[in-house]
């Protein structure tokens, strides 16, 4: 997945531990002083750009710092997820909360950043094995649908997924507005890349 690839490659090239990556990213301002990462290290799935490559854009002699690169890696990956959320919204899906899973979900900074970029509350499940839990819930849903006439996935998740309330992050108005502008710029850059690859 590109989400952790972006931060792991940035962390590795800078020779940082995960803790140091978070500390450096925390000390950079929202927007990484103008640096945006298009995090397509392995192409991209949404939008479908399998041949796309990653790019750090907006670099200058004054903003090219480890702190800004770390934050831009986190922001770029999360802005990519926001694009996927917008695709879902265009299909009529309107979430009122984001449940963040995986290694990044352990980072308080990343949860807060995700909340501000999505402009929605973000929380993580108590279970760290989200993939296995999701597979088990899907299997249970299939079984109940076949044997007992159906079940609601929402009811199953409400019954079997516990949330870590201490992990909840809420978006601030000022931060959400800043990230809305950054997301618009990110989307414009992504579309230019898409056009150049398609043509």
Segments (PLM) and residue ranges:
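Glycine/Thr-rich phosphate-binding loops that ligate phosphate moieties of nucleotide
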Residues: 1-199
């Amino acid at each position: 997945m590109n989400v952790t690839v972006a931060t792991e490659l940035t962390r590795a090239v800078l020779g940082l531990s995960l803790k140091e990556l978070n500390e450096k990213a925390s000390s950079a301002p929202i927007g990484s002083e103008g640096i945006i990462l298009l995090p397509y290290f392995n192409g991209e799935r949404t939008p479908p750009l399998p041949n796309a490559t990653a790019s750090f854009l907006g670099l200058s002699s004054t903003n090219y710092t480890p702190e800004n690169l770390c934050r831009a890696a986190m922001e770029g990956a999360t802005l990519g997820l926001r694009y996927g959320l917008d695709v879902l919204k265009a299909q009529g899906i309107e979430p009122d909360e984001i449940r963040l899973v995986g290694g990044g979900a352990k980072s308080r900074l990343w949860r807060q950043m995700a909340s501000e970029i999505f402009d929605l509350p973000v929380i993580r499940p108590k279970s760290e094995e989200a993939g296995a839990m999701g597979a088990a819930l899907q299997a249970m849903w299939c079984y109940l649908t076949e044997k007992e006439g159906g079940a609601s996935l929402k009811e199953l998740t409400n019954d079997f997924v516990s949330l870590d309330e201490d992990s909840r992050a809420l978006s601030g108005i000022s931060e959400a507005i800043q990230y809305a502008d950054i997301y618009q710029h990110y989307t414009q850059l992504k579309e230019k890349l898409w056009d150049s690859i398609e043509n």
